[in-house]
Swiss-Prot record:
It comes from Homo sapiens (Human). Belongs to the JADE family. One of its GO terms (cellular component) is nuclear speck. This is Protein Jade-1. Gene3D superfamilies: Zinc/RING finger domain, C3HC4 (zinc finger). Component of the HBO1 complex composed at least of ING4 or ING5, KAT7/HBO1, MEAF6, and one of JADE1, JADE2 and JADE3. Interacts with NPHP4. There is a cross-link at residues 114, 573 (Glycyl lysine isopeptide (Lys-Gly) (interchain with G-Cter in SUMO2)). Residues 787-798 have a biased composition (Basic and acidic residues).
Length: 842
C-alpha cells in the first residue's frame, strides 16, 4: 500500500532503511500550484522529482543477490531524497544568438593611475609602461606669456607664407631639444683638450700622493662626475672599467665632510661604520690612523686612537681648529697644519721608502719647505743627528720666486676661465639644426624660426640655460633629501640630548627626595629618642636643670619651622622658659617640705594652703580644659615627685619599683604573686563609659574605710594586668610605683575632650577629694592590724557593688592623690602646652 508523504529529512528518516513513498499526485499538484504562483505567465523549465530515488530504495529484508544492489554507507544519504532536477519543457530553454557589433572609435577604457607600478630596474609587465619612461616623455619646458605672444605672431606669418601652423606642444619640444643638445655638447667640449678638460691638463696630479706620473698597471683614473684624479693603487681600484668611472662619494650620491680636515670633496673613503668619511691622504699622513685593506684602501680605521692633543691643534694655514693636524718634521718645530691645506699651499710633503720596506712620511711647514734640495735636506738631517744646531741660510730670491709661481698659477686659472666664458658665449654653436629637424621630424624652416628665437631669448637671459639640466636636477633633489635627512638627524640628536637632560634631572630629584626622606627619618628617630629620655628623666627622679633645658631646647627648637602659620622661635622659647619656671617652682615646693622639721609646716592645713595657691593662679592664667586622658599622666608625675621626696627623707624603696623597660607591672610582680597564700580571682575589666569608671574610682578613693585610715596602716596594691585586677599584699611599707607612660608622640591623635557634664562631675569629685583629704598626714608608714585590713577591704568591696576598681590606694597613694588634686590644673595645662609646642616644632 503506497501512502503519500512529504520529502523525508534527516530527522524523518530512520536508520533501518524504511520504505519511501513515490512522488504523489498531491505533492505534484502542490508543487505545480506553487510554481504557477511564482511563474504566472511562463511554464517551469525544470522540476525536482523524488519518486525516482524512492523507487530505487528497498527494505533490508528484501531478498536480492549481492550483485543486484548497492549499500548506502554515506552518512549524508538523506540528501539523496531531495530529488533530481529534471527538465519539464525544453522549449523554454534559451538558444544562443550571436551578432556583429560595430567597432567604436572612442576610447572605452582608461587605465587608472593607481595601477601604474614603478618597478625600478625590473622590466615592466606586458601592457604596462615604466613610470620613468612616462616621466621622460613629458616635456620639461613650459611656455610663458612671451612665448605665447611670439607663437601667435609666428603663426600669422606662417599663414601668409602658406605654411602649417605651429602648436604649443611642438614649440616646447623643440626648445627642450635645443637645451639638451647644447648642454651635452658643451660638457663634452669642456672635457676634451680643446676645452681645457682635466684629462688633458699637463699639471694634473694624483689627489692622494700628489704625483703627476702614471705607470703601467697603475694608471691615473678620473672621476666622470667630480673630475678628481687618482692612481689605481692610491685609491684601491682593482680593475679600471671600460666605460665611465665614479669615485665612492659620487657613486653613492653623497657629499660628505672629511672627519680629519675642513676640505670638501677629493678622494675619500668611508670608515668601518660607513657613516663618516676621511680623505685617503689624511689617513696616510696622520700616524695613528690606518687602513683596513691596503688593496682596496678601505675602510679607514683607528680614528679613535688619535690623541686629544692632536685634535686640539690649530692649523697655521687655515686658522681653524677642526679635525686632526700634523706637525712639521723638523726638530723643535711645532707648526701644525692640515694635510689637505699643505697640499693646496704646495708645501713639501715627502714619502721615503726605507731599507726594511717601511714607508716614512715627512712633512714641512712653509718656513722649512721653500725649494729645499735633496743634498741640503740630507746634510741638515745629518747635522741634526750629530747634535749641531740648525742653520739655514736664507735665499734672498725666495720671495720673488714664490711671487712668480703665484703669478703663473693665477695666469693659468684666468686663461681657463676665459676659455670657459668663451664657450658659454658661443653656446649656439653646439646645436645642429639638421639633427634636431630629423630627430623631431619637423620641417627645417619651422626649426630655424624656433632656433633664432631660442638664441635671442637665451642672450637676454645672460647666456643661462632656459631649463635646469636633468643631471643637476637629480643632484639638487639628492642634496635636498640629504639636507632633510641631516636636519632630521640633528632633530633626533637634540631630542636625545633633551631626554638625557630630563633623565638626569629626574635622577637628581629622586636622589634629593631620598636624601630628604632619610633625613626626616633620622630627625624622627632623634625626636623619639629625646622624648623618651625626657620622660625617663622626669619619671625616675629630679632632672638637672642643664640636662632638662638642653633636652627641651633640642626637642622643641632643633629645626626652625618654615610654615607660614608656624609660631616664631622667640614665642616658643618664652613658653619653654615659662614651663621650666612653673615646673621648678612646684618641684621646689614639693621637695622642701620633707627637709623641714617644723610641725607647723608639716601640718595638713598649712600644706594645703601653700599648695593650693599655685593651681588657682595657673588655672586662671591658662584657662584650658583638662581632658581625662591626661589624668593618668599627671598621677604618674605626682607619684614621681612623691618618690623623690621619700628618697630625700631616707625612705626605703621596694626593689620591684626599679624598672628599666616599659613592661607591665604584672610581669614584674609575678614572682611575688607565687609566694602569696591569699589568691583571689577577679572579674575582667568591663568596657564601660569613661565617666562612670572615673566616678567609681573617685568613690572608692573617698570612702571612709580607705581614705581615713590611721597612719601606719597597710593597704593592698592592685596592679592592672591584661585587663584583670589582682590584689597583692606586701609586708613592708607599700609605695605606688609609677609606670612608664607611653610616648606622647604615639597618642597625639588620641586626645578626647570631655563633655560639659563630665567636666562638672570631675570638678566636683576632685574638689570633694581635695577637701576631704586636706587633714590627712603626709606619710603613713605604720602598720594596720589584720582585722582592720579585712574590714576596710570588705567595706570597700560592698561599696563598689562587686566591681573592683583599677587601683586601690594605700596611705602613701592617698597623699599622692592629694598632691595630684592640688597640682592637676597647672601640671596638665603645662603638659598640654609642651605636647602642642612639640607638634608645632615638628
Amino acid at each position: 500500500m503506497k501512502r503519500g508523504r512529504l520529502p523525508s529529512s534527516s530527522e524523518d528518516s530512520d536508520d533501518n532503511g524504511s520504505l519511501s513513498t513515490t512522488w504523489s499526485q498531491n505533492s505534484r499538484s502542490q508543487h505545480r500550484r506553487s510554481s504557477c504562483s511564482r511563474h504566472e505567465d511562463r511554464k517551469p523549465s525544470e522540476v525536482f522529482r523524488t519518486d525516482l530515488i524512492t523507487a530505487m530504495k528497498l527494505h533490508d529484508s528484501y531478498q536480492l543477490n549481492p550483485d543486484e544492489y548497492y549499500v548506502l554507507a554515506d552518512p549524508w544519504r538523506q540528501e539523496w531524497e531531495k530529488g533530481v532536477q529534471v527538465p519539464v519543457s525544453p522549449g523554454t530553454i534559451p538558444q544562443p544568438v550571436a551578432r556583429v557589433v560595430s567597432e567604436e572609435k572612442s576610447l572605452m577604457f582608461i587605465r587608472p593611475k593607481k595601477y601604474i607600478v614603478s618597478s625600478g630596474s625590473e622590466p615592466p609587465e606586458l601592457g604596462y609602461v615604466d613610470i620613468r619612461t612616462l616621466a621622460d616623455s613629458v616635456c620639461r619646458y613650459d611656455l610663458n606669456d612671451m612665448d605665447a605672444a611670439w607663437l601667435e605672431l609666428t603663426n600669422e606669418e606662417f599663414k601668409e607664407m602658406g605654411m602649417p601652423e605651429l602648436d604649443e606642444y611642438t614649440m616646447e619640444r623643440v626648445l627642450e631639444e635645443f637645451e639638451q643638445r647644447c648642454y651635452d655638447n658643451m660638457n663634452h667640449a669642456i672635457e676634451t683638450e680643446e676645452g681645457l678638460g682635466i684629462e688633458y691638463d699637463e699639471d694634473v696630479v694624483c689627489d692622494v700622493c700628489q704625483s703627476p706620473d702614471g705607470e703601467d698597471g697603475n694608471e691615473m683614473v678620473f672621476c666622470d662626475k667630480c673630475n678628481i684624479c687618482v692612481h689605481q693603487a692610491c685609491y684601491g681600484i682593482l680593475k679600471v672599467p671600460e666605460g665611465s668611472w665614479l669615485c665612492r662619494t659620487c657613486a653613492l650620491g653623497v657629499q660628505p665632510k672629511c672627519l680629519l680636515c675642513p676640505k670638501k670633496g677629493g678622494a675619500m673613503k668611508p670608515t668601518r661604520s660607513g657613516t663618516k668619511w676621511v680623505h685617503v691622504s689624511c689617513a696616510l699622513w696622520i700616524p695613528e690612523v690606518s687602513i683596513g685593506s691596503p688593496e682596496k684602501m678601505e675602510p679607514i680605521t683607528k680614528v679613535s686612537h688619535i690623541p686629544s692633543s692632536r685634535w686640539a691643534l690649530v692649523c697655521s694655514l687655515c686658522n681653524e681648529k677642526f679635525g686632526a693636524s700634523i706637525q712639521c718634521s723638523v726638530k723643535n718645530c711645532r707648526t701644525a697644519f692640515h694635510v689637505t691645506c699643505a697640499f693646496d699651499r704646495g708645501l713639501e710633503m715627502k714619502t721615503i721608502l726605507a731599507e726594511n720596506d717601511e714607508v716614512k712620511f715627512k712633512s714641512y711647514c712653509p718656513k722649512h719647505s721653500s725649494h729645499r734640495k735633496p743634498e741640503e735636506s740630507l746634510g741638515k738631517g745629518a747635522a741634526q743627528e750629530n747634535g749641531a744646531p740648525e742653520c739655514s741660510p736664507r735665499n734672498p730670491l725666495e720671495p720673488f720666486a714664490s711671487l712668480e709661481q703665484n703669478r703663473e698659477e693665477a695666469h693659468r686659472v684666468s686663461v681657463r676661465k676665459q676659455k670657459l666664458q668663451q664657450l658659454e658665449d658661443e653656446f649656439y654653436t653646439f646645436v645642429n639644426l639638421l639633427d634636431v629637424a630629423r630627430a623631431l621630424r619637423l620641417p627645417e624652416e619651422v626649426v630655424d624660426f624656433l632656433y633664432q628665437y631660442w638664441k635671442l631669448k637665451r642672450k637676454v637671459n645672460f647666456n643661462k640655460p632656459l631649463i635646469t639640466p636633468k643631471k643637476d636636477e637629480e643632484d639638487n633633489l639628492a642634496k635636498r633629501e640629504q639636507d632633510v635627512l641631516f636636519r632630521r638627524l640633528q632633530l633626533f640628536t637634540h631630542l636625545r640630548q633633551d631626554l638625557e637632560r630630563v633623565r638626569n634631572l629626574t635622577y637628581m630629584v629622586t636622589r634629593r627626595e631620598k636624601i630628604k626622606r632619610s633625613v626626616c627619618k633620622v630627625q624622627e628617630q632623634i625626636f623619639n629618642l629625646y622624648t623618651k629620655l625626657l620622660e625617663q628623666e622626669r619619671v625616675s627622679g629630679v632632672p638637672s636643670s642643664c640636662s632638662s633645658s638642653s633636652l627641651e631646647n633640642m626637642l622643641l627648637f632643633n629645626s626652625p619651622s618654615v610654615g607660614p602659620d608656624a609660631p616664631k622661635i622667640e614665642d616658643l622659647k618664652w613658653h619653654s622658659a615659662f614651663f621650666r619656671k612653673q615646673m621648678g617652682t612646684s618641684l621646689v615646693h614639693s621637695l622642701k617640705k620633707p627637709h623641714k622639721r617644723d610641725p607647723l609646716q608639716n601640718s595638713p592645713g598649712s600644706e594645703g594652703k601653700t599648695l593650693l595657691k599655685q593651681p588657682d593662679l595657673c588655672g586662671r592664667r591658662e584657662g584650658m580644659v583638662v581632658p581625662e586622658s591626661f589624668l593618668g599622666l599627671e598621677k604618674t608625675f605626682a607619684e614621681a615627685r612623691l618618690i623623690s621626696a621619700q628618697q630625700k627623707n631616707g625612705v626605703v624603696m621596694p626593689d620591684h619599683g626599679k624598672r628599666r623597660d616599659n613592661r607591665f607591672h604584672c610581669d614584674l610582680i609575678k614572682g611575688d604573686l607565687k609566694d602569696k597564700s591569699f589568691k583571689q580571682s577577679h572579674k575582667p575589666l568591663r568596657s564601660t563609659d569613661v565617666s562612670q569608671r572615673h566616678l567609681d574610682n573617685t568613690r572608692a578613693a573617698t570612702s571612709p574605710g580607705v581614705g581615713q585610715s590611721a597612719p601606719g596602716t597597710r593597704k593592698e596594691i592592685v596592679p592592672k594586668c591584661n585587663g584583670s585586677l589582682i590584689k597583692v599584699n606586701y609586708n613592708q611599707t607599700a609605695v605606688k610605683v609609677p609606670t612608664t607612660p607611653a610616648s606622647p608622640v604615639k597618642n597625639w591623635g588620641g586626645f578626647r575632650i570631655p563633655k560639659k557634664g563630665e567636666r562638672q562631675q570631675q570638678g566636683e569629685a576632685h574638689d570633694g577629694a581635695c577637701h576631704q583629704h586636706s587633714d590627712y598626714p603626709y606619710l603613713g608608714l605604720g602598720r594596720v592590724p589584720a582585722k582592720e585590713r579585712a574590714k576596710s577591704k570588705l567595706k570597700s568591696d560592698n561599696e563598689n557593688d562587686g566591681y573592683v576598681p583599677d587601683v586601690e590606694m594605700s596611705d602613701s597613694e592617698s597623699e599622692a592623690s592629694e598632691k595630684k588634686c592640688i597640682h592637676t590644673s597647672s601640671t596638665i595645662s603645662r603638659r598640654t602646652d609642651i605636647i602642642r609646642r612639640s607638634i608645632l616644632a615638628s
